[in-house]
């Protein structure tokens, strides 16, 4: 859909008319974050055990949204790449809380593993990477949790 939006003028007009509120201004003439978001989720689900994949996806879904919301609205202390300390703290809090809530389901992960994964996800969100963070956050945080789980004996 995203590629068609960019290549087919009639479709682009339709999307602009009905869905413009969902597309950021800086994404009007390029791929939106949806493609790397779906790829990141798919790679994460394919690569890691269910609990770790679910936590990593929640870190992206909850943490990234809170970082953007809080950072844009209340971000005063700039740290890396124009990101704010307030947004980063919001990311960590949202990611950890989503992990805690995940533990209320049938999926049970050690809180220390969730905290480590949330911190890795927040650091990845701060880095000026050439790839979209929607792709990188769940893959890297999931990989970190998988590595920690395997080296500590949690599986």
Predicted regions and their residues:
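Interhelical loop and helix-boundary elements at the membrane-water interface
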Residues: 2-102, 109-151
């Amino acid at each position: 859909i995203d590629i068609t939006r960019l290549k087919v003028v009639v479709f682009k007009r339709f999307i602009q008319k009905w869905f413009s509120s969902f597309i950021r201004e800086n994404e009007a003439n390029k791929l939106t974050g949806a493609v790397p978001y779906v790829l990141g989720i798919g790679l994460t689900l394919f690569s890691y055990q269910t609990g770790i994949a679910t936590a990593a996806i929640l870190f992206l879904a909850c943490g990234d949204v809170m970082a953007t919301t809080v950072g844009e609205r209340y971000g005063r202390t700039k740290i890396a790449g124009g990101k704010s300390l307030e947004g980063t703290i919001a990311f960590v809090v949202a990611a950890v809380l989503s992990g805690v809530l995940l533990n209320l389901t049938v999926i049970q992960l050690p809180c220390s593993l969730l905290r480590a994964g949330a911190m890795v996800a927040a650091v990845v969100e701060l880095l000026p990477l050439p790839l979209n963070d929607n792709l990188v956050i769940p893959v890297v945080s999931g990989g970190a949790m998988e590595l920690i789980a395997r080296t500590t004996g949690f599986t």
